[in-house]
Regions:
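Hydrophobic alpha-helical transmembrane segments
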Residues: 20-27, 53-102, 280-284, 296-320
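Interhelical loop/hinge segments that connect adjacent transmembrane helices in multipass membrane
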Residues: 50-55, 77-78, 83-84, 93-134, ...
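Membrane-water interface segments that mark the loop-to-transmembrane alpha-helix transition
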Residues: 1-8, 21, 184-211
Length: 320
């Protein structure tokens, strides 16, 4: 309801081409996403870690498949927006089709209503920080550049596309992998850093391999999939380079580590530390993103500094 009521304040600037359809889809998506997160949180509370991983993993897979399907059929803006929002129906299908999901979804809280409200508040804080770090940076970066500078606008558009592409190879498999990681972690929770080291090493290894591949093949592959228009050639020369693409891929490994460490901290019932890590990561990334540094420099710094500091908070919580 709040999204719908406040839409006149932000919709014209943020989704000028979508109009009422975009606002309606976003409002419905926000409402249904609350149920999605209820299943996600309850699965953690019930220690149903494979369901926990499935809720997040299939969310990402569904979104990619839906967007590709719409793109092949029509690529109409409303269709693409609906495809982006459609994973909020995943919780409903899981509850209807999976007995374990029904059991978890119907479980009752094991704390008082006051404590439950407090936990909800923490969850809202961490979800907000997560959303800012995952998807809010483009808005901040866009607000921080001169709207009359067409080159900066094009550079930002190419940079956002590059960030989206370089994140996917690590973040999507992580969604399916983290349930296994949490389950293995809990078996060794008396030695949390040792338990965290193996999956963390795997993620960093994937990040290094991906960065090397991006350095060697990234510019060629990017240009093949997204050939530049004449107005984009100069922007491509700055963004679509081997060092930049390699750094973007490796940055996604640190974001993945933050996501994984957050899941492990939640598994240990350290909710405040979980929120603190995500909030610190989001705040630092936002501050760096709007700093007076050159656009490309501050974007790369924001992608590294925020997740690394948030990760350190989570690791500190595991130890102390």
């Amino acid at each position: 309801g709040l999204t719908l009521v406040t839409s006149p304040l932000w919709a014209p600037a943020q989704i000028p081409l979508s109009g009422f359809n975009g606002v309606l889809l976003l409002s419905v998506g926000v409402a249904l996403y609350a149920m999605h997160m209820t299943l996600y949180g309850a699965s953690a509370g019930q220690e149903s870690w494979y369901l926990f991983a499935s809720v997040s993993g299939f969310d990402a897979i569904w979104r990619i498949v839906a967007i590709c399907a719409v793109g092949l059929v029509s690529a109409h803006l409303v269709g693409l927006e609906a495809a982006t929002v459609s994973p909020v129906l995943l919780w409903l299908l899981m509850v209807l089709l999976l007995p374990e999901a029904r059991r978890v979804f119907g479980s009752r809280a094991d704390v008082s209503s006051g404590r439950l409200l407090y936990n909800y508040t923490l969850s809202m804080g961490s979800s907000t920080a997560n959303a800012v770090l995952m998807m809010g940076l483009p808005l901040l970066l866009n607000a921080s550049i001169d709207s009359n500078d067409s080159l900066q606008q094009v550079i930002l558009a190419v940079l956002i596309l590059a960030i989206s592409i370089t994140r996917s190879p690590i973040m999507i498999p992580l969604q399916a992998f983290q349930g296994v990681a949490v389950s293995a972690f809990l078996k060794q929770q008396n030695h949390p850093l040792r338990a965290f080291a193996k999956p963390a090493g795997a993620l960093l290894g994937v990040g290094l391999v991906g960065a090397a591949a991006a350095y060697a093949l990234g510019p060629w592959l990017f240009g093949l999939l997204y050939p530049p228009k004449p107005s984009e050639v100069e922007a491509y020369a700055q963004v679509v380079t081997s060092p930049v693409l390699a750094l973007l891929v490796f940055a996604s490994a640190f974001l993945a580590l933050l996501v994984l460490s957050g899941s492990l901290v939640i598994a240990l019932n350290m909710h405040r530390s979980y929120v603190a890590g995500w909030v610190l990561a989001a705040v630092v990334a936002c501050v760096v993103a709007v700093s007076p540094l050159p656009l490309l420099t501050r974007t790369l710094l924001a992608l590294y500094t925020g997740p690394v500091l948030g990760l350190l908070v989570h690791l500190g919580a595991m130890v102390w």
